[in-house]
Amino acid sequence: MNEKLIGKAASFPYMIWDMDGTILDSMRYWITLGADYLKQQGITPPEDLSSTIEAMTLEESAAYFQKEFGIDLPVPEIIAGFLSLIADEYRRTIPAKEFAAAIIKQAAANGSRMCVLTTSDHDLACEALQRVGLLPYFETVLTAEKLGMDKRSGAVYEAVMEKLKFLPEQTLICEDALYAVRAAAEAGANTGAKVLAFRDIANTGDWEKIRALADYAEESL
């Protein structure tokens, strides 16, 4: 592991952490989730489905499925269907990323204040983080949906920093997806916050763009 980068990241007094693909090695399940759900409904999914819904919240994805694929179910029921396909993985098998865990533990030892900001389900997120032993290190687990925002704009990170009274110029935002890194960089440009990007199996095609946007980058898969 890059011990120098771990030390640098852990030196930030405030940290905002994405979960899937950043803390947890879970993106392999999300990549196929939408397609798996449609197949379960007897619908052939389009090839570009994963990239289409990547930046959406669960609620937005469910509404999209209603509109585009004629799923005649309420949004909460569609979301429940999504989650039923991956809940067991969160509760039993999805591991933490070693590099992320090392930063989190060292940052906690340094007295850093940290939160999670995810587009995933809050309860499943907490269960998974508890199982891998990382939940106690975070002040709170926030979801973009509960904040009434998404990760396509830097505004959500600015809102979190304001809500938790994080000093922006001393805050590190940890993300993996291109759209989220771009939004985090936007927040950084506005506030002075820095961005650490994590490489993942789901972002390899965008990695050069991600590296160009982030202040720091963790290269290993």
Task: Identify the role of each PLM range.
Residues 1-13, 105-108, 121-122, 126-221:
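Asp-based, Mg2+/Mn2+-dependent phosphohydrolase catalytic module
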